[in-house]
């Protein structure tokens, strides 16, 4: 037999082994119906390893043998989610779920029952898996929803993550979203092993899963008992998906993904609540941790009609399980001062294990909450992890109150700077009146200014900000741009290299956008989306600073409260000086050429971008359209006016044609932008 014939035979055997192993992985992980014993599976895998060792050129990234982990990385790379990974609104009571259903009916102008998909909310970490032509090319964390970290090597080690999709009919580009978690049995075994070797135990399965996913050495991840359960899709191009959420889950299962077997449909909101109650009753007997049930409108057409708010879809809600509660003793109450001067009482507790973690602090919110609880230092209290995340005191056990219990005295003066504490007539929150004179407010203002969604100064972390303010090197925002390498290198846990990297990050942050700068200023009630609306409306900081409240409320998403705080911010000379100092330090952006909102040429028009744009990025195209007054939506509906379709446009383009909508290519978009002065 010739060498060529031998190689052909080996290649055929390797291909057959890979297909067999993928098939049996699918039977085992997705269907939970193995067809062969573990020993036979091990023999198939061993034979494949032997052949690949003899013929290294035959090894491909999607081979089942490549799950073992690769060489350690020095750091994770940042990746941008083309379609944001939004969070979900939460419901904590049955009334919240009923209200959610009513909002949907009202928005759809319908009295008919809505069909919902009911899914278990796995307690793990959300991830994104990107497939091109059926092959896994990238895996990422959710991150802040817009940007995450590239953890492809780690995700490849998880057996329930398909490296190559099964079957046919999947889109050319498919982004699958799911939850990586650690089953209880695997978690217990992991901790038992750690206990036997004297290592530190993991607190709960979620923390163990998070630690495993964020290992720079994927071989460590490969040794951890992780699973990935698919629950939705993101980017889809070059193919069609079923018209319901449950249909999509069925398709994902057929392509090799693990989906949750408990998922069901409910024809009424009462059925949703009954499903929640049935799962809650056997929550502890499940093989994995869950922290609630997610209800999603099942029909994709209705999902698209309902749309999104800036942080979450309108068509889904997470009904959280009641938090676990424990009793402990309130040892003291301290008062913290936040970025906007809010003085918040923080309970210092005798440490107690509740909801899977050891809790020693809890929020008391404000003076009204202290009075409502009737709490005293020394009391025995019931602590709950609200939403299984934020510990809070929900009740005082007065029968256990000691004779030496002391009242909680709310301060009249700021515990940090000594300025008077004020409470507005219509607010429950007490605030330090010191403004940026207060070191605590300065610290929080700088942290916000440097945060990822603001000016994104990488390396300027919370602890370093604390040091810089405490040592007097930074007394106002602009001071961070006057820091020297020598000053930074002298800080704790800093060296010359870290100092140089931070100086470069500070320099890079000087080139920003008007929207990010407005957000970075930390004006009360002005979040990321509202800052963008203000930038698009006024075009320049000067025009924004001159606007009165009556003008400001005309801006989309700006109400009377937000308008008041914006006007108040720019009316204060100290804030105007802070802005001037920042601009003098070199912070700059390109002003937007906009006039009044009535004159914006695309006002009232809705655009959808799909496919790949070649001359500019989709983000740039979106920014130009927004600046001209258009609304840019993420999905096609009958309300869409124009669809901009680049190469690779898929289901959105097809739907646009079905609805007989106006479709334009990138060149037509560029002509439109030139016509209105956005491009030369």
Swiss-Prot record:
Q: What is its EC number?
A: 6.5.1.2
Task: Supply one GO BP term.
Answer: DNA repair
Which positions bind Zn(2+)?
414, 417, 432, 438
Q: Does the keyword Lyase apply?
A: no
Q: Where does the BRCT domain start and stop, copy by copy?
A: 597-680
User: Which of this chain's residues are annotated to bind NAD(+)?
Assistant: 38-42, 87-88, 119, 142, 179, 296, 320
Q: Which GO terms describe its molecular function?
A: DNA binding; DNA ligase (NAD+) activity; metal ion binding
Can you quote a single GO CC term? cytosol
Q: Which InterPro entries match?
A: BRCT_dom (IPR001357), BRCT_dom_sf (IPR036420), DisA/LigA_HHH (IPR041663), DNA_ligase (IPR001679), DNA_ligase_AS (IPR018239), DNA_ligase_CS (IPR033136), DNAligase_adenylation (IPR013839), DNAligase_N (IPR013840)
- What is the protein's known function? DNA ligase that catalyzes the formation of phosphodiester linkages between 5'-phosphoryl and 3'-hydroxyl groups in double-stranded DNA using NAD as a coenzyme and as the energy source for the reaction. It is essential for DNA replication and repair of damaged DNA.
Q: Which PANTHER family match?
A: CHROMOSOME TRANSMISSION FIDELITY FACTOR 18, DNA LIGASE
What is the name attached to this protein's record?
Answer: DNA ligase
Quote the gene name from the UniProt entry: ligA
């Amino acid at each position: 037999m010739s060498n060529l014939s031998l190689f052909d035979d080996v290649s055929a055997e390797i291909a057959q082994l890979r297909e067999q192993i993928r098939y049996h992985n699918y039977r085992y992980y997705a269907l939970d119906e193995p067809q062969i014993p573990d020993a036979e599976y091990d023999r198939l895998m061993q034979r494949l390893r032997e052949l690949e060792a003899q013929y290294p050129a035959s090894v491909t990234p999607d081979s089942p043998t490549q799950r073992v982990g690769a060489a350690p990385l020095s750091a994770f790379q940042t990746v941008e989610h083309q379609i944001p990974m939004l969070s979900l609104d939460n419901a904590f009571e049955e009334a919240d779920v009923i209200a959610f259903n009513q909002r949907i009916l009202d928005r759809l102008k319908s009295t008919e029952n809505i069909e919902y998909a009911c899914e278990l909310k796995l307690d793990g970490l959300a991830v994104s898996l990107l497939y091109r032509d059926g092959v896994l090319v990238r895996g990422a964390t959710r991150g802040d929803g817009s940007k995450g970290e590239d953890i492809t090597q780690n995700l490849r080690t998880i057996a329930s993550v398909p490296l190559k999709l099964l079957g046919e009919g999947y889109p050319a580009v498919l982004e699958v979203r799911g939850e990586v978690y650690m089953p209880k049995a695997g978690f217990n075994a992991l901790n038992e092993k750690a206990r036997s070797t004297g290592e530190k135990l993991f607190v709960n399965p979620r923390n163990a899963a998070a630690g495993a996913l964020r290992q720079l050495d994927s071989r460590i991840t490969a040794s951890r008992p992780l699973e990935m359960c698919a629950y939705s899709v993101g980017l889809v191009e070059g193919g069609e998906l079923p018209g319901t959420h449950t249909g999509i889950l069925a398709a994902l299962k057929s392509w090799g993904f693990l989906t949750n077997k408990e998922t069901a449909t409910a024809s009424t909101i009462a059925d949703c609540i009954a499903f929640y109650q049935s799962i809650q009753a056997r929550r502890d007997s499940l093989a994995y941790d869950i922290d609630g049930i997610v209800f999603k409108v099942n029909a994709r057409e209705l999902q698209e009609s309902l749309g999104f708010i800036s942080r979450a879809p309108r068509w889904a809600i997470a009904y959280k399980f009641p938090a676990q509660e424990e009793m402990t003793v309130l040892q003291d109450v301290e008062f913290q001062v936040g970025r906007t001067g809010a003085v918040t009482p923080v309970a210092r507790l005798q440490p107690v294990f509740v909801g899977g973690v050891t809790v020693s602090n809890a929020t008391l919110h404000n003076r009204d909450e202290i009075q409502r609880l009737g709490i005293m230092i020394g009391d025995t209290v019931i602590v709950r992890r609200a939403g299984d995340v934020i510990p809070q005191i929900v009740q005082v056990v007065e029968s256990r109150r000691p004779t030496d219990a002391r009242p909680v005295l709310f301060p009249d003066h700021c515990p940090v700077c000594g300025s008077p504490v004020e409470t507005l007539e219509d607010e429950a929150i007490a605030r330090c009146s010191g403004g940026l004179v207060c070191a605590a407010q300065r610290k929080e203002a700088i942290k916000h200014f440097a945060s990822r969604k603001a000016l994104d100064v990488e390396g300027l972390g919370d602890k370093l900000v604390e040091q810089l303010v405490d040592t007097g090197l930074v007394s106002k925002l602009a001071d961070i741009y006057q820091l020297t390498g020598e000053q930074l290198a002298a800080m704790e846990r800093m060296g010359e290299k870290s100092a140089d990297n931070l100086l470069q990050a500070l320099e890079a942050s000087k080139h920003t956008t008007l929207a990010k700068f407005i957000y970075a200023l930390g004006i009360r009630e002005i979040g990321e989306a509202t800052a963008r609306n203000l930038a698009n409306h006024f075009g320049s900081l000067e025009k924004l600073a001159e606007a009165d409240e009556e003008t400001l409320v005309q801006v989309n998403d700006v109400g009377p409260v937000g308008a008041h705080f914006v006007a108040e911010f720019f009316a204060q000379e100290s804030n105007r000086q802070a802005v001037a100092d920042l601009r003098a330090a070199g912070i700059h952006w390109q002003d937007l050429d906009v006039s009044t909102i009535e004159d914006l040429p695309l006002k009232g028009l809705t655009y959808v971008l799909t496919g790949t744009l070649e001359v500019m990025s989709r983000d740039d195209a979106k920014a130009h359209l927004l600046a001209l007054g258009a609304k840019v939506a993420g999905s096609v509906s009958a309300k869409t006016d124009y669809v901009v379709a680049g190469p690779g446009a898929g289901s959105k383009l097809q739907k646009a044609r079905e609805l007989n909508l106006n479709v334009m290519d990138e060149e037509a978009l560029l002509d439109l932008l030139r016509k209105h002065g956005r491009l030369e």
